[in-house]
């Protein structure tokens, strides 16, 4: 089986996850991509899109941004965002939901619109964010329109589209 992908699309975390389950024959890295191959296993059930638990009890999934743990920029933002947010807001490009969970630790947020273009990340975020105040949107943040005026926006850019930072 040959696995090929862009580094910005999460191929490195996918290959890292594969190494936990099978012996990788070889890995080739060129420009912004990587390719790995391995012998076809007898049982392919291990390779289904199954979320994994990380530090803090969060779930992530191979292929989504920062699937191995919370990235340093998000940790820094989380320290500040929960202090002054109130009213209705949005988490644009929320990934698997870390910043939203941290923001929702305050009771002064009445409603949070969680917008994510990556369906795998959105599905994992639904598992991580168990809060009635959140509405989930599978949408490109460049095209999403807020249903009403927002009091705040949470973002940790850049976002990636077709391998380019936006």
How does the language model describe each region?
Residues 50-63:
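A short, charged helix-loop
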Residues 91:
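Class I SAM-dependent methyltransferase core
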Residues 1-47, 62-84, 94-166:
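S-adenosylmethionine
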